[in-house]
Swiss-Prot record:
This is ATP synthase subunit a. The chain crosses the membrane at residues 24-44, 45-65, 83-103, 117-137, 143-163, 177-199, 206-228. The keyword Isomerase does not apply. Mitochondrial membrane ATP synthase (F(1)F(0) ATP synthase or Complex V) produces ATP from ADP in the presence of a proton gradient across the membrane which is generated by electron transport complexes of the respiratory chain. F-type ATPases consist of two structural domains, F(1) - containing the extramembraneous catalytic core and F(0) - containing the membrane proton channel, linked together by a central stalk and a peripheral stalk. During catalysis, ATP synthesis in the catalytic domain of F(1) is coupled via a rotary mechanism of the central stalk subunits to proton translocation. Keywords: ATP synthesis, CF(0), Hydrogen ion transport, Ion transport, Membrane, Mitochondrion, Mitochondrion inner membrane, Transmembrane, Transmembrane helix, Transport. F-type ATPases have 2 components, CF(1) - the catalytic core - and CF(0) - the membrane proton channel. CF(1) has five subunits: alpha(3), beta(3), gamma(1), delta(1), epsilon(1). CF(0) has three main subunits: a, b and c. GO terms for cellular component: mitochondrial inner membrane; proton-transporting ATP synthase complex. Belongs to the ATPase A chain family. It comes from the Eukaryota. It is found in: Mitochondrion inner membrane. It is a multi-pass membrane protein. It comes from Trypanosoma brucei brucei.
């Protein structure tokens, strides 16, 4: 009985390792294909749609892994709970980024206002960044608590590998989010101040034209006065 149990456990572990390898490979292939497709088709909206597509893909990928481990181990482990927490975290960040941060671009892109709007814009950017950072810290702290509670579990080995894997994923996820936010903020500020500079330049040229026209009108009036006198 022990021999059959050991063989059965060995094959289950082997199947799970194979599924891990295939899922990682599919994730890398999908991510690269998604980058190429959106790079050629979406242009300026590439970062936004890639972010949402990546969150949806992680959602489906984690759900498939949850179902697979549920069939193998007949229970919901700490890893499943943590993955569900990651799903909620990623979707909430996507919602926060799309509907709270980019709302300023969609609502106020046609308004010509002063520096007070820029203050509101940077305050919104700062609040959104702090909210994302606090949620990331909560996610990592929850993962550490789950990891400490898992020290005596039979799932320790896979959880240990997933610890480094999710740290790696969240690191690049944070770099990716920072890159998107920095590009949007930099482009918006650059276009805004270039537009203000062009507007000031046009106003200066218009004032110069009005001044020259007034001078020419005075000269013409003076010449007509000399002619008739």
């Amino acid at each position: 009985m022990f021999l059959f149990f050991f063989c059965d456990l060995f094959w289950l572990r082997l199947l799970l390792c194979m599924y891990y390898c295939v899922s990682r490979l599919c994730f890398i292939v999908y991510f690269n294909c998604l980058m190429l497709i959106f790079d050629f088709l979406l242009f300026c909206l590439f970062d936004l749609y890639l972010f949402v597509g990546l969150c949806l893909f992680l959602l489906l990928w984690f759900m498939l892994f949850n179902l697979y481990s549920l069939i193998l181990y007949y229970c919901i482990t700490y890893l499943n709970l943590y993955l569900l927490f990651c799903i909620v975290f990623l979707l909430y960040i996507a919602f926060l980024f799309l509907f709270c941060f980019l709302c300023d671009f969609f609502l106020f892109n046609n308004l010509l206002v002063g520096d007070s709007f820029m203050d509101v814009f940077f305050i919104r950017f700062l609040l959104c960044f702090l909210e994302c950072f606090s949620l990331l810290c909560r996610c990592l702290s929850t993962f550490l608590r789950l990891f400490c509670n898992l020290l005596s579990s039979h799932f320790l080995l896979l959880m240990f590998f997933d610890f480094f894997y999710f740290i790696f994923v969240f690191f690049f996820y944070g770099v990716f989010c920072y890159f998107i936010l920095f590009i949007f903020v930099f482009c918006f500020c650059l276009l805004f101040y270039v537009f203000l500079y062009l507007l000031d330049l046009f106003a200066a040229i218009l004032q110069l034209f009005i001044f020259c026209n007034m001078i020419l009108q005075l000269i013409m009036d003076f010449l007509l006065f000399l002619l008739f006198v």
